[in-house]
């Protein structure tokens, strides 16, 4: 053997070994993923789906990564490249704008979360945001302080305008001047010019004109102005001692409208004047309509309202606006002279004393009747003195059985009723005012092209509708050229919103539903045609299990040429000619056959006017029994779209949104799974050659997530074939059984592939946290039988859980249930019907269907009767008509059968399910000495809004399940409760530390 070679080999081995050893000693070991704890949720960062924005040229994408609590950042990166920049955005993300040429980016940077929290403790402290403007080719960033509203100048993309936020003056009043500085910046060189006291501004679509309104102290210089960006000339359009508001450009940018409001001390509201401005070959003719100068046609006692934005008709012949009643200011009666009033009162007292002394001395008074006659005879003549003007009135409400709307509903709607206004128009070519809407037609929609309007009057049916929930209305057609109205349909029935009229884009026809069929009404000819009766498909939504008659499936949309409507049956999409003569086509063809639902169309152009059948259309698809999702494409044909959809994406994930760049064939779609956060991918028109753009959830590798999901098939006790999603716990080992929480709310198995971001929900529930912490989560579907909403849950959930147990995943002795609102009701009811579950957490549950029926849904002010009879309650009448059903399905009347420990969340200001529902069940269980804890958060509504409350309950609910399902030690609040005097100390020990 060559000794030298051996020595070299040994030396090399020694050096290599030492190097590896040194590297091993200095390298940081990879962190082992752990279950996520609630205190780690606050710092969890993720992409906000609504923030994802494509540049018009398709070159750039911007998106925000925000924490649950704290400060976030904006990521700006190349769509097909790794080039990117990250910018801080503070504690709030306001959105982002690209210039139309894709060269510039602008966004607001909010204050830091620490500053926001500190300011919250200092009443009156004003915080200011910054505007950041970025040149994408160089990453040069320019910052502007005190940023308010901002916008690039449309197609020209040469300037950006920024409204600077005013500093609030001490003692500022709501009526003070609202104008502030407006800054206009030339993007290419950063040069700027400004105007003071600007309250509103807006560019036209081209971006060559900037309209702005001035609102100055003392109304000095108030008016409407127009700035030509190229010539830098300002044109004064109108000025007056008035306030100007509601600036509104037409979509084309060839005209705009606004309101001029003048104070009149005799009335509570300002008097309005509508102003219209046209853009015509370098000139800007102004059209003004002042109702005070038109006593002949404008209704007396009314004015143009400031509560509706005016706008031009498409042909620029008319201005549309709202009018409302003027409410006079009540004159205060002069207060009586205090000296004279005192003297008068002394005189009355003296006269009364003398009269009573005389009566007392009268020996002829023997009986009560004698006394009453003497008192009446001796009453002083003449009027009583006027009551002082500051007499205190009672604070009360009168509830009358003849009220069409409950007083509670009237209270909720009070401001809307006060500000109610009627659509009217002014023809600038004839100088004619026309009131389009009257007091009979309280609801009105002006249709496209402003030729017609549809109005509804439900006054004859409103009383009954508030009781039984069945919706009827009288439908009127209004000709906007003449102002004449025609009753089209009397007592038109809306089993659901899908039966309501939907107009064509040329404004001459509308689609509506009746008796399970779709019809087209032609307004110029006043004719109607049934367009679905001859088709080999039903458009009745047979899966709608509410107490309504023949609800329809949904409209996909009108075609842009107004010749077709695209309508879904339960599976496929049909292209149906509106003339009722030509042949309808099943575009998707295989939906029913393959149990694929073609759910709807992706609208890729937000400014489109109808579905362009000359372009490919992208359709969302979903596998009813596989839970797959994807995107299919329909191609243009000789007549409309070509039958037969091409599947572009079809996978075991949730394919969510699809977007397209405004000016490029660049598409972006989202994809997620139950254990994989939502990511966005750039692709082409065929959805091939995809590139992942986002990198969501930067900290996801630190934590353990669900190990998988299983689809559980089962049959309800009533023979319905149903499914449930069984999410495996993190670290799942086959053959091992796990504690499980069952969650439900009607049908949710379609969420099998949906990612649930860690967070503090308003109900305390987050399945991602539960699976991360070793729970299996099972989400079964529930379908309903009329008059048995509680028993329906029993018939579905119990067989579902039994089927899930057969998978071998679930420990049958460690199952809990949870639901909120209607799901809370199902939880409360299930706890009365079975001992299968070892713990139950019910959020805001309905517990007494008899008393709940007659209570108020305080958030809307309406009664619960309509909800019970035509909506979620699924009863066919009131309790007196269906007594056994109400008792049979009420947790409170079955409370003696409860064996499951119960945690109830119910808040004292719950405006959906009255707080008394939780109290009733709690007290009944307590009376029966059954384990129950009710958690109440003061001032909270149906769900928890305050972050500190959401944090607190999220932890408590998991502690509850940990104790009963995992055998963890019981916290003191669960074991023995907390006395009132110790509550503050208890809460202090549990409070989350504020995030740095």
Language model feature labels by segment:
Residues 534-546, 687-689, 694-814, 818-820, ...:
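Cap/lid segment of the alpha/beta-hydrolase catalytic domain
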Residues 434, 454, 529, 681, ...:
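Hydrophobic/aromatic beta-strand patches that form the interior of the parallel beta-sheet core
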Residues 1-30, 846, 863, 996:
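Bacterial Sec-dependent N-terminal signal peptides
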Residues 458, 622-623, 672, 743-747, ...:
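Glycine-rich His-Gly loop
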Residues 307, 316, 450, 553, ...:
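Active-site lining segments that contact anionic ligands and/or coordinate catalytic metals
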Residues 757-996:
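Active-site-proximal cap/loop segments of hydrolase catalytic domains
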Residues 218-219, 265, 281-282, 478-484, ...:
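Secondary-structure transition/capping motifs at alpha-helix termini
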Residues 16, 22-678, 682-683, 971-979, ...:
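Beta-propeller folds
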């Amino acid at each position: 053997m060559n000794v030298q070679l051996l020595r070299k080999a040994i030396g090399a081995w020694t050096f290599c070994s030492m190097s590896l050893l040194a590297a091993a000693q200095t390298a940081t070991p990879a962190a082992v993923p752990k279950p996520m704890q609630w205190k780690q949720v606050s710092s969890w960062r993720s992409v906000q789906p609504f923030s994802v924005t494509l540049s018009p040229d398709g070159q750039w994408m911007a998106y925000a990564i925000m924490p649950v609590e704290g400060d976030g950042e904006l990521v700006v990166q190349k769509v097909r490249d790794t080039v990117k920049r990250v910018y801080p955005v503070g504690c709030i993300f306001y959105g982002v704008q690209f210039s139309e040429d894709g060269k510039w980016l602008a966004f607001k940077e909010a204050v830091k979360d620490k500053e926001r929290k500190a300011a919250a403790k200092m009443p009156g402290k004003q915080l200011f945001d910054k505007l950041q403007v970025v040149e994408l080719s160089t990453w040069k960033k320019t910052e502007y302080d005190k940023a308010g509203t901002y916008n690039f100048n449309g197609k020209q993309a040469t300037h950006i305008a920024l409204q600077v936020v005013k500093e609030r003056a001490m003692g500022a009043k709501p009526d003070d001047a609202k104008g502030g500085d407006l800054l206009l910046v030339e993007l290419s060189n950063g040069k700027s010019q400004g105007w003071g006291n600007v309250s509103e501004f807006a560019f036209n679509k081209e971006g060559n004109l900037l309209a702005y309104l001035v609102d100055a102290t003392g109304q000095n210089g108030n008016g409407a102005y127009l700035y030509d960006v190229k010539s830098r000339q300002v044109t004064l359009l109108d000025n007056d001692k008035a306030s100007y508001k509601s600036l509104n450009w037409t979509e084309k940018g060839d005209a705009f409208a606004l309101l001029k409001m003048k104070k009149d001390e005799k009335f509570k509201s300002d008097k309005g004047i509508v102003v219209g401005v046209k853009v015509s070959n370098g000139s800007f003719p102004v059209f003004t309509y002042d109702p005070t100068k038109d006593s002949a046609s404008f209704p007396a006692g009314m004015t143009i309202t400031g509560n509706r934005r005016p706008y031009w008709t498409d042909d620029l012949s008319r201005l549309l606006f709202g009018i409302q009643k003027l409410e006079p200011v009540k004159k205060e009666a002069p207060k009586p002279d205090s000296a004279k009033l005192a003297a008068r009162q002394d005189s009355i007292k003296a006269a009364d004393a003398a009269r009573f002394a005389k009566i007392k001395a009268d020996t002829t008074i023997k009986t009560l009747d004698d006394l009453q006659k003497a008192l009446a005879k001796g009453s002083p003549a003449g009027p009583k003195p006027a009551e002082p003007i500051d007499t205190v009135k009672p604070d009360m409400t009168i509830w009358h059985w003849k009220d069409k709307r409950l007083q509670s509903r009237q209270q909720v709607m009070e401001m809307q009723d006060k500000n109610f206004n009627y659509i009217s128009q002014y023809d600038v070519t004839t100088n004619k005012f026309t009131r389009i809407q009257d007091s009979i037609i309280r609801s009105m929609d002006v249709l496209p092209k402003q030729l017609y309007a549809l109005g509804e009057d439900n006054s004859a049916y409103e009383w009954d509708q508030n009781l039984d929930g069945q919706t009827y209305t009288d439908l009127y057609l209004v000709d906007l050229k003449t102002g004449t109205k025609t009753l089209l349909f009397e007592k038109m029935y809306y089993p659901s919103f899908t039966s309501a009229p939907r107009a064509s884009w040329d404004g001459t026809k509308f689609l509506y539903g009746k008796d399970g069929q779709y019809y087209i009404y032609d307004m110029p000819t006043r004719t109607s045609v049934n367009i679905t009766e001859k088709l080999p498909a039903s458009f009745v939504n047979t899966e709608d299990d509410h107490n309504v008659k023949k609800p329809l499936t949904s409209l996909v949309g009108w075609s842009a040429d107004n010749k077709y409507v695209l309508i879904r049956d339960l599976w496929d999409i049909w292209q149906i000619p509106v003339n009722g003569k030509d042949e309808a086509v099943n575009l998707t063809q295989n939906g029913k056959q393959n149990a694929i639902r073609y759910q709807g169309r992706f609208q890729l152009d937000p400014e489109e006017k109808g579905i362009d059948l000359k372009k490919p259309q992208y359709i969302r698809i979903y596998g009813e029994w596989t839970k797959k999702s994807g995107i299919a494409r329909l191609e243009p044909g000789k007549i409309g779209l070509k039958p037969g959809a091409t599947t572009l994406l079809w996978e075991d994930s949730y394919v969510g949104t699809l977007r397209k760049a405004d000016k490029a064939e660049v598409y972006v779609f989202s994809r997620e799974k139950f254990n994989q956060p939502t990511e966005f991918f750039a692709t082409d028109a065929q959805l091939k050659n995809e590139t992942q753009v986002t990198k969501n959830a930067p900290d996801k590798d630190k934590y353990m997530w669900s190990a998988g999901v299983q689809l559980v098939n089962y049959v309800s006790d009533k023979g319905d074939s149903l499914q449930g999603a069984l999410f495996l716990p993190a670290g799942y080992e086959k053959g091992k059984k796990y504690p499980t929480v069952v969650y439900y709310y009607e049908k949710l198995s379609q969420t099998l592939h949906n990612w649930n971001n860690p967070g503090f929900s308003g109900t305390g529930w987050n399945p991602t946290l539960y699976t991360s912490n070793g729970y299996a989560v099972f989400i079964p579907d529930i379908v309903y039988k009329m008059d048995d909403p509680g028993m329906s849950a029993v018939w579905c959930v119990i067989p579902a859980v039994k089927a899930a147990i057969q998978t071998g995943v679930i420990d049958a002795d460690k199952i809990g249930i949870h639901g909120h609102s209607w799901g809370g009701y199902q939880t409360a009811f299930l706890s009365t019907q079975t001992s299968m579950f070892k713990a139950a957490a019910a959020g805001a549950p309905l517990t007494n269907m008899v008393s709940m029926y007659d209570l108020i849904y305080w958030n809307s002010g309406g009664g619960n009767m309509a909800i019970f009879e035509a909506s979620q309650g699924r009863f066919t009448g009131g309790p007196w008509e269906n007594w056994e059903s109400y008792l049979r399905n009420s947790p409170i009347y079955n409370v003696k059968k409860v064996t499951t420990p119960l945690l109830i969340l119910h808040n004292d200001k719950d405006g959906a399910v009255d707080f008394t529902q939780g109290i009733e069940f709690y007290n009944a269980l307590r009376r029966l000495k059954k384990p129950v804890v009710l958690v109440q958060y003061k001032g909270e509504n149906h769900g928890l809004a305050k972050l500190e409350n959401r944090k607190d309950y999220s932890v408590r609910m998991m502690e509850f399940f940990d104790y009963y399902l995992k055998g963890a030690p019981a916290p003191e609040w669960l074991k023995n409760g907390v006395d009132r005097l110790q509550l503050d100390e208890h809460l202090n020990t549990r409070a989350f530390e504020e995030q740095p």
